[in-house]
Each structure stands twice: as structure tokens, then as C-alpha cells.
Amino acid sequence: MLPSTIQTLTLFLTSGGVLLSLYVSASLSYLLYSDILLKFSTTKITAPTMSLDCANISNVQAVNRSATKEMTFLLPEPEWTYPRLSCQGSTFQKALLISPHRFGEARGNSAPLIIREPFIACGPKECKHFALTHYAAQPGGYYNGTRKDRNKLRHLISVKLGKIPTVENSIFHMAAWSGSACHDGREWTYIGVDGPDSNALIKIKYGEAYTDTYHSYANNILRTQESACNCIGGDCYLMITDGSASGISKCRFLKIREGRIIKEIFPTGRVEHTEECTCGFASNKTIECACRDNSYTAKRPFVKLNVETDTAEIRLMCTETYLDTPRPDDGSITGPCESNGDKGLGGIKGGFVHQRMASKIGRWYSRTMSKTERMGMELYVKYDGDPWTDSDALAPSGVMVSMKEPGWYSFGFEIKDKKCDVPCIGIEMVHDGGKETWHSAATAIYCLMGSGQLLWDTVTGVDMAL
């Protein structure tokens, strides 16, 4: 009798051969979208050659001596991502702390990288924790200069969310002292900016390929948002700005598809200074961004970008809860919504994320607890309304970082569950050792989950004197 493996081949692979086609039918159900076409790609699988040199050759006359056959499968391509309704919940809770320098005694490949400007971006299957490193680790001998924003050594790196950004764990994507990244459902788009202040360059990487560039237009520190860009239907939108840190800096948006710039968008409205925007989808039609004005006001410039018309407008947030740092007392700025008020010089990137519900929308924001220093971080929310015209105070929703702990940049992102999106806010907690020692950051993460009240704040647990 033939061996069982040869019996199987006898049944399915005759001398004429059989083409096996597997048709996969899939339905991607988005709560905000329908009629999404599922495309297919052809995959060929070749079975290994099996020699049939048996003792009794008469037993195998019906079987070809070579059993190599090609089987063609029609497999679904990954689909473009679209915003969906948020997962259920009414409060944020402490989700995760990434505090690399708690492991600062490790050396070699296990040493934590010295980083700043962390942010998180998510694809359908994973989230990545990004940051800008100084190409140095702690402990190490290259601490000098790690407090500077821009130099020739800085790189955009990432690890899988939940991993510690060590030398060994980190992927180095490109040289960059400003960065962003996003996933379109099929592939990652990475953004890095570096070069001299007077002629910086945006570089785009799609998957593993470097695909496009964009040159400085004001010759004054071209830079991007330091948080995730936003993709819908294969189009990804990136905020950039170029101009003085204490004067005019007009932003633009780049529309990017598969790693290549296909359109520039020039916002209208209150455009004097807009930088470091944190952006997300209010709906399948509109991207909204809460940004930083480092020159004129402690109010946040608020962008509405229509992805159907590729137009954008900027106005100041009207709320009496001022979100920048430094800032005046809440409610102290008089006049119309576009009034700048005082204490507008200087600023900080702010956290912002949407909670999309069937009957309403929630907008969640973060700001430092201190009005003058980068200390502490508190969460606020406002349901429905228009940030351009609503002057009401935002509702405080809990302390994420106490006044005793550093609260620097913050950002928003969304984790993709099976049928909904989970809104989250991340907080950069900087270990500021001054110019003489290392200068790096931990990341605290809070996400929408369950009900009740936000229960506990985050500490880094790092003592720089150790």
C-alpha cells in the first residue's frame, strides 16, 4: 500500500493537475461607513516536490513522479481605515506607564534611549510608541546636548506599544528632530524633519521605502506636529508649520497617499501662529485639531479640516478654560472669542481626542495643573457644541499627573478594537536634568474605559540622583 501522504496526493493532484481557488468573502462593517469594496490579491503557493522512488514502481504508475503544483488563492488585501464610533465608556482611567529610566542601571543593548516628544499611533493590528532620540542611552557618556531640540544626531524611533524604548527594542526610522506617523490600514507612513533651521526638510517613508520630501517655505524651522497624522480612505493628513517661535508661523496641511504628497492645503482664518497640532476625526468628514500658539495667546488655535473639499479654517477656542501654559486666570480674557489676552508668549503641545457617539460627540483635552510651569496634568471634557463659539468652561474630569510630577507635551490617539475605536491621551513626563546631565522622558497613557471617576494619577518613579 502507498504511504498515506502519497495517497492524499493521488486523490488531489492527478497528472493533469488541479487549480484550487479559494474565494474569500469579507465584510468590513464600519459604523460610519458602508459599501466599502474589499479588494483581492493573488497569492501562489507551491507544494514541495516529493520523490516517488518506491520499491514496487507498479504501485505508483497513476501518480506523476513530480508532485509540484501551484495553488492560487485569492486573499483579501488589507482595507483602508476609516473613523468609527468610539467604544463605550464615560471616563478615562490610567492604562499604562512607560518609564524607561526606571531601568537606568542596565547597560549595553538593554539601556533605555534618551528621548523626548513621544507620541503613539495605531494601525488595525498594533500601536507603536514613537519618540525622537538623541542617539544616546542612559547610562552613557553622551549626555551633553540632550536638552537641545535640534541636532544632527536626533532620529525618529519606535517600539511596539508596551515595550521599553531601549537600544535593543527600538527601530530607527529616519534622521529627524521633528516627527509624525500614521497607518492608513495597509501600511505605515513615517514623517521626519531635519536639516538646518533656515532650510529644513520633511522626509516621508512609506513602509520601508523613502518616498517623498517637502522643503521649507518660510526658512524658519519647518516642523510638524509631534503626534499622529490622520488617515481616511487611503489619504493621510499631516499638519506642518514654518516660522518664528515668537512671531508669525503659518501652518499648512499635506495630503499624503501611499507615501507621496498629492495636495497642499492652506488654512484660512486666524492663521498668525499655529504649531504642534493634535488632530483627530470628529466625523467621517471633518478632522479637528487643537494647536499651540507660541507667540500671541494662551488660547488654543482650533482647526477644522473638511476632507471632502480639502479646505481648512482656523479660529481660537472660545472657552474660558485656557489650555496653554503659561496662561492667565480662567475667564480673565475679555472681548470676543478672537481676543488674544495676555501671557501669550510661550506654550506647550496639548492633548486632544474625540469620543464619537451615535447621538453626540465628546471632546477631551489635557492641560498642565500649573499655570506657569510644566507640572501636573488634568483632563477636561466638553460634549457637543462648537469650540469656536462656546465660551462655557470645560468640565474637569480628573488628575492624570499631580503638581509634584512633570507634565510636558500631551497628545491624543485611538486604539482600534474589533468594532470601535478607543480614545486615549498620552502625557510626556520629562526628567529635566538641565544642561549638565541627561534629559529624557516617560510616557503616561489614559484611555476611555468604563464609568465612574478617574481614580489615580501617574508618577515616573525616577530619581535622577541615583
Swiss-Prot record:
Which cysteines pair up through disulfides? They are C87-C420, C122-C127, C182-C229, C231-C236, C277-C291, C279-C289, C318-C337, C424-C447
User: What does the record give as EC number?
Assistant: 3.2.1.18
Activation and inhibition: Inhibited by the neuraminidase inhibitors zanamivir (Relenza) and oseltamivir (Tamiflu). These drugs interfere with the release of progeny virus from infected cells and are effective against all influenza strains. Resistance to neuraminidase inhibitors is quite rare.
What EC class is this?
hydrolase
Q: Which residues bind Ca(2+)?
A: D293, D324
Q: Residues on the Virion surface side? A: 32-466
List, in alphabetical order, the Gene Ontology terms for molecular function in this entry.
exo-alpha-sialidase activity; metal ion binding
Give the free-text PTM comment from the record. N-glycosylated.
Which Pfam families does the record cross-reference, listed alphabetically?
A: Neur
Binding site residues for substrate: R116, R150, E275, E276, R292, R374
Q: Where is this region: Hypervariable stalk region?
A: 38-86
The answer to keyword Transport applying to this record is: no
Main subcellular location of this protein, as a coarse class: virion
CDD domains (alphabetical): Influenza_NA
Q: Which residues lie on this side of the membrane: Intravirion?
A: 1-8
Q: Where is this region: Involved in apical transport and lipid raft association?
A: 13-35
Q: Which residues form the active site?
A: D149 (proton donor/acceptor), Y409 (nucleophile)
From the UniProt entry, list the residue stretches annotated as the region Head of neuraminidase.
89-466
What is this entry's stated membrane topology?
A: Single-pass type II membrane protein
The protein's job, in short, is: Catalyzes the removal of terminal sialic acid residues from viral and cellular glycoconjugates. Cleaves off the terminal sialic acids on the glycosylated HA during virus budding to facilitate virus release. Additionally helps virus spread through the circulation by further removing sialic acids from the cell surface. These cleavages prevent self-aggregation and ensure the efficient spread of the progeny virus from cell to cell. Otherwise, infection would be limited to one round of replication.
Q: What else is known?
A: The influenza B genome consist of 8 RNA segments. Genetic variation of hemagglutinin and/or neuraminidase genes results in the emergence of new influenza strains. The mechanism of variation can be the result of point mutations or the result of genetic reassortment between segments of two different strains.
Q: What is known of its domains?
A: Intact N-terminus is essential for virion morphogenesis. Possesses two apical sorting signals, one in the ectodomain, which is likely to be a glycan, and the other in the transmembrane domain. The transmembrane domain also plays a role in lipid raft association.
Q: Which family does it belong to?
A: Belongs to the glycosyl hydrolase 34 family.
Q: What's the name of the protein?
A: Neuraminidase
**Upper taxonomic lineage:** Viruses, Riboviria, Orthornavirae, Negarnaviricota, Polyploviricotina
Q: Its gene?
A: NA
